[in-house]
Curated annotation (Swiss-Prot):
Protein name, entry field: Phosphate acyltransferase
Functional summary from the UniProt entry: Catalyzes the reversible formation of acyl-phosphate (acyl-PO(4)) from acyl-[acyl-carrier-protein] (acyl-ACP). This enzyme utilizes acyl-ACP as fatty acyl donor, but not acyl-CoA.
Pathway where this protein functions: Lipid metabolism; phospholipid metabolism
Family membership: Belongs to the PlsX family.
């Protein structure tokens, strides 16, 4: 299998991207890694060129570029060339830590959505206290969604959780302002009614945002605006929490500092639990092939995790299974 990688996308490209490939190569012996970008810069960080293809490109899409305009005008950019490789069948999947808007636009324009899926969604695996994590979608690919969009998201998320993360009968829930069936907006209530009648997924009803990190569901479905807001709140809370704990210890007495030293290992474990480095990237689900977005400031470990995530997606043929599923629904 071949994975196309935008080596020039991200805050720390190409260094962290290439070093992430070095890590992933040690575990993914059946993968050829296609690195799109400045060959000279890429080679500075490569351990060796085994299972590596370097494709020279002359342009880079910046975070401030208009996504649609950039896709059309910067056709020799590392991002566009990598996505185009998937379109042409020269690669099986694509990874980028570059512009989210540009990657989503390129995915829709070049890779194309599954015909019966009206709105693809951005989905990521987020941490929970029990270490299992949960998949949430949509995280911002769409700002407004209908009930039928949410139903599609539930199916997409359930298939991903089962086939890629190996969760048997994943519990699927809708974000709402209460767990009761009567709670929620008209859109959520309509989606709840449709999902409750479906037997192909394990729909458990509504879930409140306060229960997400305690592992109340394996797949959480919401509209893109709400999902993005929740994601940013989780990221911000985790950052502030760790910062405040450290500040409180450092500002305390000698006894407090000694206590802080004693709990350093458990705190490190908490930091690892809340870290998304091992979770992979955000998958743009609903497209005909895997398109995965890594965080702009991804570490080399996060890039390696995203590549392993893509490997699982390809190995399980989750995109192919989804295409067949939605085709059967259309009959």
């Amino acid at each position: 299998m071949k994975i196309a990688i935008d080596a020039m996308g991200g805050d720390f490209a190409p260094e962290n991207i290439v070093k992430g490939v070095n890590l992933a190569k040690k575990e993914l012996s059946d993968v050829t890694f296609q690195l799109y970008g400045d060959g000279a810069k890429i080679r500075q960080f490569l351990d060796d060129e085994t299972a590596i293809e370097i494709i020279e490109t002359t342009e880079v899409i910046d975070f401030h570029d208009d996504p649609v305009a950039a896709i059309k005008s910067k056709k020799d950019s590392s991002l566009v060339r990598a996505v185009t490789a998937v379109k042409k069948g020269e690669a099986d999947a694509v990874l980028s830590a570059g512009s989210t808007g540009a990657l989503l636009t390129a995915g829709l324009m070049l890779v194309k959505r599954i015909k019966q899926v009206s709105r693809p969604a951005l989905m990521s695996t987020l941490p929970t206290a029990d270490g299992r994590g949960f998949d949430m979608l949509d995280l911002g690919a769409n700002t407004e969604n209908t009930a039928h969009h949410l139903v599609d998201f539930a199916i997409l998320g359930s298939y991903y959780a089962e086939n890629v993360r190996g969760i048997e009968k994943p519990r699927v829930a809708l974000i709402s302002n209460g767990s009761e069936e009567s709670k929620g907006s008209p859109t959520v209530k309509e989606a709840h009614e449709i999902l409750s009648a479906m037997t192909e997924i394990n729909f458990i009803g509504n879930i409140e945002s306060r229960d997400l990190l305690s592992g109340g569901a394996d797949v959480v479905v919401t509209d893109g605006f709400t999902g993005n807001a929740i994601l940013k709140a989780i990221e911000g809370t985790a950052t502030v929490l760790m910062k405040e704990i450290k500040s409180a210890i450092m500002a305390g007495s000698v006894t407090t500092k000694i206590g802080g030293a004693l709990i350093k290992k458990p705190l490190s474990g908490l930091k690892d639990l809340m870290s998304t480095d091992g979770a992979g990237g955000a998958a743009f689900v609903g497209l005909k092939a895997p398109v995965v977005k890594a965080h702009g400031n991804s570490s080399e470990l996060a890039i390696a995790s995203a590549l392993k995530q893509i490997h699982k997606m390809l190995e399980s043929d989750v995109s192919g299974k989804l295409v067949k599923h939605f085709e059967n629904m259309d009959k």
